[in-house]
Amino acid sequence: MKNQINSYAQARISFYEASLQRKNTPQLVDEFNQLAQSRGWTAERSYFSTALIYEMLHRDIDISAIAIWDNEKEKIHSLHYTQVRLDEVAKSLVTLS
């Protein structure tokens, strides 16, 4: 898992542009909710964290990393679509590993 998270962080969470393009796509949210329900997770999160989790799932990165960060830091809900914030997420993922 550590290697997966580090690789993901080094890529500076490159899904940024893709998640912006998907911003108004109800199918993304529906698909995420189905995945979340099948794994027993609640989907009561902001769009940003939903997109982040969605991409982590599709890249086979352990969801527990972001879930821990979300619960302990309670910071992800206020993230904005900026590279600076995305880099902070990447650094936090590396720290968790």
Region spans (language model):
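Extended, charge-rich alpha-helical interface modules
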Residues: K2-S97
